Amino acid sequence: MINATDSKGTFYKLNQKEGIPIVFIHGVGLDHNIWDPQINEFDNTVLIYDILGHGRTPLNKEKISFDDFSDQIIDLIDELKFDKIHLVGFSIGSLIARNFGTKFSDRLKA
């Protein structure tokens, strides 16, 4: 299990295994810890992280959009050198996932 912060300040946990990575997005007022029970339950690599302004990831601007959240994911998966991902979202995380799919559909497996 890797606990780290990427070059843009996003805190994440990574359980490196095989297959296409599964990325979990938490909801408002929560952080990556909501997904702790899932991180070891998959044969695939699992990535959990703190969305902007939550947990250990700072918010460095006054206004934020769904595009900012989607850009956060693309920056993180690019840095980790993930080509395609599976994306799972809860609450606002599902809206972020929908936005990500609109902007970066070529990076989604499911």
Predicted features by range, described:
Residues 14-58:
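Conserved HGGG/HGGXW glycine-rich cap/lid loop of the alpha/beta-hydrolase fold
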